[in-house]
Amino acid sequence: MTAQAPLSVAPFLQTPACPSEAPGAVLPFSLNYSRYVQRLAQARAGWAERVQAAAAGPISVAWLSARFGELFEAAAAEPEQALKRALRLLRNEVFAALAERDLSGAATLDEVTGAMTDFAEFAVRAAIAVIGQELGALHGQPVGQSSGEVQELVVVGMGKLGGRELNVSSDIDLIFLYDEEGDTQGGPRPLSNHEYFTKLGRRLINALADVTEDGYVFRVDMRLRPNGDAGPLACSLGMLEEYFVVQGREWERYAWIKGRVITDPGSPHAARVIQQLERVTTPFVFRRYLDYGVIAAIRALHAQIRAEAAKRSNAANRQHGGHDSQVQAHAPNIKLGRGGIREIEFVAQVFQLIRGGQDFGLRIRPTLEVLRAAAERGLIGADAVARLTDAYRFLRQLEHRLQYVDDAQTHNLPGAPEDQLRIARMMGFADYAALVAQLERYQDEVAQQFEQTFSDKQDNQPPCAAIWHADLLDDERTESARAQLLELGYADADSVLERLRASRHSPRYRALSEVSRQRFDLLINRALDHAARQTDADVTIARFLDFFDAISRRSSYLSLLSEYPQAMARVAHTLHASRWAADYLTRHPQLLDELLDTEALSAAPDWQGFRERVRERLRAAGDHVEMQMDILRQEHHAETFRILLQDLQGMLTVEPISDRLSDLADAVLDLTLETVWQQVSTRHREVPRFAVVAYGRLGGKELGYASDLDLIFLYDDDDERAPEVYAAYARKLITWLTSHTAAGMLFDVDTRLRPNGAAGLMVTHFEAFRRYQMREGDNAAWVWEHQALTRARFCAGDPEIGARFEALRIAVLRQPREAGPLRDEIAAMRERVLEGHANPTPLFDLKHDRGGMVDIEFTVQFLVLLHSAAYAELTRNAGNIALLRMAGELGLIDAARAARVADAYRDFRARQHKLRLDGQSAARVPAGTCAHEAAHVRALWEQVFGSIDAASPTP
């Protein structure tokens, strides 16, 4: 991204286009180029020298305050008149000093806009202080009816003032607010609070905007207040909130993005009001869910603004005699025209409005900061942001130079040739043609990015429009639609028509707004077309209709799919490829947003980046527990969906899928632990001495999309409060993981593998756990619990406890064991598992039937428990396939048979995974499908345990 650099016009001083005095020691730049500065200097002796001194360094708030004090005292008038004169004289000095620093190359764009913003805030505060003192003497102080506290006028700066981007000859957009209704107290002529603040507001506007012999301070625009010019000048927070709920319009959301309190935020009253104001404005501006409806709304607003800009430009051209400038055919209004400043602002704001409800990091005001944040999140390319940044700075600098000439609030390029050359030289170009050429390049780049972001991608005539728009209750037209469906490849056209008819005449469809209904109609037609391209069109369209039923009440989702046809194509593929994926997307339609990021759909996960991003979102949510729970669920669902999409595209096999799902679960557990600890009111230390150990699928890193988590909780803390604190911690953790919120749930959790199962303590001191596993004492672990240890691992929490657990696990596994008793125990446990998962069908259960996955897992566990004392490498939690290979290489079992069984396990897992994706709860296949693989598994079992038929459960 191009760094900001000051722009100097020094090479072009003393040009014929600038008939001012020759440059000298005093204001050589502004006096050469600004007619307004020339007039000020000619009117007041010594004025230019004072401004020259002020321009020696950046304009600071301290300097503003000191200089205002001097001018106020020198005015020698009544306070309000002295205020007006001092602010106007100060404003002229600030304008000229900034022009000098800017044109000389001493000031950056940020310095100029920052200084103008500082001055505007200072002027508003100074005016309130002076006028408020006079009003207080007459009417007393406004007091809140409920709180009994003195009230203050809260001034909200909107637009560029709110974003600290004020230009040098700008008006300022203000909104006047106050906290409570009530009356003034302590004065001879009391008023209601509303009357008092209205009077204060009017006099504040006059103090800033009245044109006197000294000029003006700022033009003040109050039209952004509730109900615009028809609304009260000052309104209470309660009225503002009611207005947002009842009448708030879409464009007002954009305006309030940059709304910022500019009156003194330091007082306790102001701090409280700011907090209350955020509570009112945040849900209005930033919707809780992804809001893609703003794209069409901004597109419409932009068209209206551009048309108005063109009308103004045409009027300006007529006023200037229709100068035949080469730029007039392009876009003379650099703010509102094609490729102008407003288009850059809209590109930035659309990301805020769509995602700001969920991403606190996008709730910022300056345009360039928003673009940088969007690039960091992958919402827009870094190259595009660099181009927009360069264009924005160029356009803002050009805007300032247009305004320096006559202190006019203009954004139009000049028509007079002498002014065209003047502006070109102020921008550092030798002539006007060179300026226009560069301007056109920037405008083209901005317009191209704007069109890419906001272009209307809707089909003019969707291919299946005749089907959905037909009167589906009319027999003749229904027959035509039926024939078209058959032609498109639908097998059971009557069933499809029945579903379409039910959807079209449902109360849900009828309740849609006109705009949402139009989008729904468009999407149904696209869905019919996309489904027809799949191998099973009937199934796909049925899933589409279920999906549309789920999302139809959320106009944002309809907007997203309408605006991004490529997302619709990916939805079709997802719905067709997997019943489980279709159900998952239907339950979590916010995941539609993930379909827009093509790069993310093919990238490997960055778990460190994931942790940092989620941690930042959780931190930004503060103490909002439900919001934090939703953030964890949103992030987990999004990452799961990315894995799922890569899976459906054939990019991953089952092993890396399980690895990624397990890594994701680890990360979510870690983040949840961090967050929940802060919610434990009885916590006794900054960092808990607490660890989560995973067993089962998560422990073996064989997690599936819908697997539950087998967890136990260990702590190593001798504080007398520790057992109670960590028990509460564990219970709260489970609640956070398993609760259903608006965003869904995270995991089902099973803690029955803890010592003594469901009858045992929820959390276990590490030393007690060690004694239990090592069988020191009467309360000792069973063989099946040592079997479970073969694929247990530390997954979250205190890494020191995790390391001690791993050392203990290895020690337990390496204990010497007698083959006979161990074989009997494990064979008996296998029989009990088989009895608990009876298969009444002729199908082969890939997991539980003899010759299936459980036989392989129990065989591996037996080999690990029997031989780890001699072969330490068997204690590695490396997965069943790797452990089978090790056992074969060590000669513990036949190596060739081990390889065949490993292949069978891999095949079983892949088949199980596919069946789960197809929505089947039991992983069963026709018996002959896997007969060869199952025979190898049974052969290995018989080699290790003896005949399957001979095995029987122990009493």
Curated annotation (Swiss-Prot):
Q: Which cofactor does it need?
A: Mg(2+)
- Gene Ontology cellular component annotations, sorted alphabetically: cytosol
Task: Using the UniProt annotation, give all residue ranges assigned to the region (Adenylyl transferase).
Answer: 464-955
Domain of life of the organism in this record?
Answer: Bacteria
One Gene Ontology MF term: [glutamine synthetase]-adenylyl-L-tyrosine phosphorylase activity
Quote any Pfam family the record assigns: GlnD_UR_UTase
Its UniProt entry gives the catalysed reaction(s) as:
[glutamine synthetase]-O(4)-(5'-adenylyl)-L-tyrosine + phosphate = [glutamine synthetase]-L-tyrosine + ADP; [glutamine synthetase]-L-tyrosine + ATP = [glutamine synthetase]-O(4)-(5'-adenylyl)-L-tyrosine + diphosphate
Q: What is its EC number?
A: 2.7.7.89, 2.7.7.42
Alphabetical list of HAMAP family matching this protein? GlnE (MF_00802)
Its protein name is Bifunctional glutamine synthetase adenylyltransferase/adenylyl-removing enzyme
Q: Which organism is it from?
A: Ralstonia nicotianae (strain ATCC BAA-1114 / GMI1000)
